């Protein structure tokens, strides 16, 4: 399988998806036809989100079609060489994808050679479930099971920092809560600016920041760019 799972879409001082464009270009391998899954978009319309994505990827020769615009979404997925899943609210993304019957077809198409690109919520969707999203559950997705393309759970935008005087839980504490009720899981705290690239059977960590791996009953382990999962 070919996956590009990004923690986020924007870095300080850079344009939207700018840091991801070289990664995408290097993983296209001649692929040009993409479907975009915009359902995580809440404060922007799906048309706006699709057009924004298409404009950014056009210089790479990628032709982007919004899945909500086609008469036969299943046929569009089957024909797609690239499946792109944008960030936003993970619960809405999963709900809309499930209700349209897109989850199994997307997973099957990626397993048969389509490149999967997802940032934030899109990275969450590639995991076995969306249980490590940071998002508010604004809708009921009728279950948390997702695409299960990547075997570990990703927590995007990971940071353990708290504002001065803030008394709420750290991100690690929240992850530890999950591991109490689901000790079989492994959670990757993927900070902004980092990504996981899967190609030729190898999953490799990239990005400038330290990534953390959490397992039940164990201390967190720090990983740097180049680590192979």
Curated annotation (Swiss-Prot):
It is found in: Cytoplasm. One of its GO terms (biological process) is proteolysis. The gene is pepE. One of its GO terms (molecular function) is dipeptidase activity. The active site is at 120 (charge relay system), 135 (charge relay system), 157 (charge relay system). Its EC number is 3.4.13.21. SUPFAM superfamilies: Class I glutamine amidotransferase-like. Hydrolyzes dipeptides containing N-terminal aspartate residues. May play a role in allowing the cell to use peptide aspartate to spare carbon otherwise required for the synthesis of the aspartate family of amino acids. It catalyses: Dipeptidase E catalyzes the hydrolysis of dipeptides Asp-|-Xaa. It does not act on peptides with N-terminal Glu, Asn or Gln, nor does it cleave isoaspartyl peptides. Belongs to the peptidase S51 family. This is Peptidase E. It comes from Salmonella paratyphi C (strain RKS4594).
């Amino acid at each position: 399988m070919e996956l590009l799972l990004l923690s986020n879409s924007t870095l300080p001082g850079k344009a939207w998806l700018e840091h991801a464009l070289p990664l995408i270009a290097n993983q296209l391998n001649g692929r040009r036809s993409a479907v975009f899954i915009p359902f995580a978009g809440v404060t922007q319309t799906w048309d706006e989100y699709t057009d924004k994505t298409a404009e950014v990827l056009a210089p790479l020769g990628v032709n982007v079609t919004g899945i909500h615009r086609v008469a036969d979404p299943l046929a569009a997925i089957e024909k797609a060489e690239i499946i792109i899943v944008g960030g936003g609210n993970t619960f809405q993304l999963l709900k809309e994808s499930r209700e349209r019957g897109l989850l199994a077809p997307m997973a099957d198409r990626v397993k048969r050679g389509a490149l999967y690109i997802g940032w934030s919520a899109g990275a969450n969707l590639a995991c076995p479930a969306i249980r490590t999203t940071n998002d508010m559950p604004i809708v009921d997705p009728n279950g948390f099971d997702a695409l299960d393309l990547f075997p570990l759970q990703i927590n995007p935008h990971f940071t353990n920092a708290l504002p001065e005087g803030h008394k709420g839980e750290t991100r690690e504490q929240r992850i530890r809560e999950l591991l109490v009720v689901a000790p079989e899981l492994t959670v990757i705290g993927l900070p902004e600016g980092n990504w996981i690239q899967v190609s030729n059977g190898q999953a490799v960590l990239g990005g400038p920041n330290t990534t953390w791996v959490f397992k039940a009953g164990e201390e967190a382990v720090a990983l740097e760019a180049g680590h192979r999962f």
